[in-house]
Amino acid sequence: MFKGILVSLLASFLFGYMYYFSTLLKPLSGTDIFGYRMIFTFPFVLLSVTLFKQKAALIERLKRIQKRPHLALSYLLCGLLMGFQMWLFLWAPNNGSSLSVSFGYLLLPIVMVAAGRVFFKERISTFKFIAVIIATLGVISNIVLKGGLSWEAIVICLGYTAYFSIRKALKNTDLASFCLEMLSLMPVSIYFALQTDFATVQQTNPFIWGXLVLLGLISGTALIAYVIASNMLPMNLLGLLGYVETIMMLCVSFLIGEQIDSESYPLFICLVIAMILVMVDGVYKHTQKEVYKCHLKK
């Protein structure tokens, strides 16, 4: 398990660093960076399919699409939802929105807990229920003080919740399905990449090609590390360690000069408290499982 924790932390560190790394790719726009990230990351996704023995599952899904072409629409929809989130992740640090996106990632687990209860009738623990209430109070305070959440935070919460909910409802939660979602994004990614005027870009950033290849390497390595960790760790612990990435995103936001305005303090404090409660819940459940396993061995 210790190795799994280290691999998960590596994935979170790489994803968090990528948030900062996008600021080194100027003068490329968020759309340009997104296109090249998808192109350079896709080979790593294919490698992951081979490494984690998902080729049979991928072939089976392709055969299903061949027999029932309308199934391709589900992968296209999920691909678009996921792709927009990836674009926003790379766009935000260069456009003064990294804190808003970080707030969205802080709120996301709480929204997913609520969605799980409403749409999938999942049970909510006491800790998570309190976390949902506190996060809701934070959102209400932001609506009263600022008129609402930022559009970036709303897109993160609703977009990712819709993405994961659709995948769960259609039972398309494996790596093979993710590969097809990435494949659906290749045409638009290539189009975005071809629109880049590299002659102009290289005058400002002569090392841009090397930096883009490095972006793909960071993104691909992070993806593979996360998949490895997901196979080595319980889901509760994996989700708990995922908060490391969110914390790093907040640190990056402060590092590049963004500041929390006074009207956002109540929301920030409520989200941090909610995050801590979700983490406590994860630790508690994981500890209970370990104790139960020890009793079984006796």
Swiss-Prot record:
Classification via SUPFAM superfamilies: Multidrug resistance efflux transporter EmrE
Membrane topology qualifier: Multi-pass membrane protein
Keyword Transport part of the UniProt annotation: yes
Location in or out of the cell: Cell membrane
Keyword annotations from UniProtKB, A to Z: Cell membrane, Membrane, Transmembrane, Transmembrane helix, Transport
Pfam short name (any one): EamA
Disulfide links within the chain: none
Transmembrane regions listed in the UniProt entry: 5-23, 33-52, 72-91, 101-120, 127-145, 149-166, 175-194, 207-229, 238-260, 265-284
The keyword Iron is annotated on this UniProt entry: no
GO CC terms: plasma membrane
Ranges of residues in domain EamA: 13-144
Family to which this protein belongs: Belongs to the EamA transporter family.
Protein name: Uncharacterized transporter HI_0680
Organism from which the protein derives: Haemophilus influenzae (strain ATCC 51907 / DSM 11121 / KW20 / Rd)
